[in-house]
């Protein structure tokens, strides 16, 4: 029981950073292509500061549910930080892109009628697109892409 809890995020029920690291180590041993979708929830601090941490927790939980629905049985979802998640998928680049589209749709649907806005920045990376397709490199690429998306979204809001 305790070993299982060590790999679970209490708030969301998703795998935590330790579970993601364990999966990445297993992926490194495999030759199968894989990809990551990094997800960063926008404005969580603003929700926590204005509406309180219980509302922020509800937002995190809602995004986690969006990720689980989007990944369905094709991928694994992890909460790796306060407002950061990663979805890992094996198979094809097309499956990765389709999952990212489903995440965007799920998050947009969660935003409809919400008392606070729900949006997320996404970054994708596929192992076969990398010169060094090890999990750490693919993760860095997805993380960089997520921050670029976050910057683009902020610029669009300010325009």
Predicted regions and their residues:
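A structural signal for hydrophobic residues in beta-strands of small regulatory alpha/beta folds
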Residues: 88-89, 126
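Conserved long alpha-helical elements within nucleotide-processing catalytic cores of c-di-GMP signaling
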Residues: 4-7, 16-35, 42-69, 78-82, ...
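Catalytic-core segments of nucleotide cyclases and related cyclic-nucleotide turnover enzymes
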Residues: 53, 97-104, 121, 126-159
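A structural signal for short, well-ordered beta-strand segments
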Residues: 36, 85, 120-124
